[in-house]
């Protein structure tokens, strides 16, 4: 503290006092005097405020499987006026799943379904907002990527008697596929040792023997 002959005084703190939180304070009293020696005091109080924490965020991507996926991680928080890595515990229900975070910043996301309907190139995303203990917000973004789930495809085993001409037989396969239209096949024409087989996009196949 400095004071001039006109009584104008000026106080400069010797640090930023960022460690002071709301409700904290430091006080100091300075004694000055008039020109005839009469003393007086100047009392300075520095009140704490909430200095915003520096909080990490998270962005994760996981592939869907045949069951509800789970992923987890840990956020960090650097806070000059609160304990580091202190978070507000929370449990958040989202559109694609639920997220929990504990006081140490450890979070866990659990999907609410297997998301088997997602094909390669498909995805669902969701962003959760969490906060450190001082209220500084951060986000956790979870992306679930689609994969190719194997279809359940029928087979066919047929037996035909030979005749005096090249025999023909046919049938239809079925396909159940969670991430593609059901009963969708790749058309093909296959030359075999005993005959030729064709199959169309609907799974209908025809075998024609190459001799009688």
Would you name each region that the model predicts?
Residues 47-54, 147-152:
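Proline/serine/threonine-rich low-complexity linkers at boundaries of modular beta-sandwich domains
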Residues 54-93, 152-190:
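Extracellular ectodomain surface segments
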Residues 1-48, 66, 75, 91-145, ...:
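Acidic, turn/loop-rich segments in luminal/extracellular domains of secretory-pathway
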